Swiss-Prot record:
Signal peptide: none
Any GO CC annotation of this UniProt entry: cytoplasm
Membership in a protein family: Belongs to the MsrA Met sulfoxide reductase family.
Enzyme class: oxidoreductase
Residue positions of the active site: 52
Function comment: Has an important function as a repair enzyme for proteins that have been inactivated by oxidation. Catalyzes the reversible oxidation-reduction of methionine sulfoxide in proteins to methionine.
Protein name listed in UniProt: Peptide methionine sulfoxide reductase MsrA
EC number(s) on file: 1.8.4.11
Annotated source species: Yersinia enterocolitica serotype O:8 / biotype 1B (strain NCTC 13174 / 8081)
Record's catalysed reaction(s): L-methionyl-[protein] + [thioredoxin]-disulfide + H2O = L-methionyl-(S)-S-oxide-[protein] + [thioredoxin]-dithiol; [thioredoxin]-disulfide + L-methionine + H2O = L-methionine (S)-S-oxide + [thioredoxin]-dithiol
Source organism superkingdom: Bacteria
GO biological process, one term: cellular response to oxidative stress
Amino acid sequence: MQNFDKTAVIDAANALPGRLTPMPVATLHVVNGHSMTHVPEGMEVAIFAMGCFWGVERLFWQQPGVYSTAAGYSGGYTPNPTYHEVCSGRTAHAEVVRVVFDPAIISYKQLLQIFWENHDPAQGMRQGGDVGTQYRSAIYVLTPEQETQAQESQALFQQAMTKAGDSRAITSEIAAALPFYYAEDDHQQYLYKNPQGYCGLGGIGVCMPPNL
């Protein structure tokens, strides 16, 4: 047990069992007052992992056309995990942000550009000083169209990195979305509630080519 590697994704057989009861979630987003759970007609959902979800959630709630955001966990096996369990590396979940957006105002392609340009997608199971599988970079897609656009955007950003002299390979996971589990209320809109709180978010200085 002492030799457990938090940078290796655990398999389902060894993941924590979790629980049947969902995490209680606030009714309204504290920044904009919108519903934390409802997706209004005509709006769409995106799920991104870019390291610690505190800064990621703030990045997206600041975007015009984003209706609501929520910090949570996805990509793993443990149902309804706690933050402590996710940090143990024994759930296989990543820290993610669920973004509800109006595609008439901000497109999924624009959200992808924000994703690629605002973190380091070539660090594997870490993001800066935050180390562990929960900090991996990932795009969890909900439709075939999202998958196609995510794959195309990754190829373009890889080209942009190479052109900028960064020879590393992108390690971001692109996969079909598994169940999204809300994080504890303390983590929702964390940097609004704690303006001086930790934010490890930062890009690598590479811009997405304009033909995304």
